[in-house]
Amino acid sequence: MNTDLEKLVFKWITTETNKVDVSGDFYCQTRDVFEARNDKMPEELIKKGLDDSLAYLVYAMAGELGNNAFDHNVGNWPNIMGAFYAFDYDGKDGIIIIADRGVGVLNSLRKAVPDLKDDLDALEMAFTKKISSRVLENRGNGLKFVRGNVSKNNLLLEFFSGNAKADLNHEMKISVSDQIVAGCLVILKFQNI
């Protein structure tokens, strides 16, 4: 399902900086644009038949993931500021995609853990430890919240950053990705039950 959206986001995140489409419906240059679009999502999903509780759960998860794009890149965007945000639901299968062309998980977490080895270790740490690059703030639980809800609700999550990919469902598998992602790319899939 939604292979067109997945192809579109991979193109958006890997295209040369001067060729990135920042005029499209899926581009959110600022947090307020992202939040306004995300706030509309639950009602749109419910109108298409998604269970209310699942609609609001994936809304909360998308909010966490999308806000991370802005929180961890503020003042540090290497090229294109903002995030790609898209969602779709066909009455049975749903997808939410969030991507940013920011510093990525490894470079973000190295602010708190300078000796972090590679993208694989960074993803492992991000999903399992209470850690944040914003070391003076009490943060670092967002991806644990996402991971817990993916597992509890039989959702599927793919998270790409650098040369690493985390696949989450009831278990988490971290591997080297065929696709290099400068920044982060998240694909969340869900089904109405």
Task: Identify the residue ranges that each predicted region occupies.
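Conserved beta-strand-loop-beta-strand hairpin that lines the nucleotide-binding pocket
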Residues: 7, 70-193
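Bergerat-fold GHKL ATPase/HATPase_c domain
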Residues: 1-63, 67, 71-85
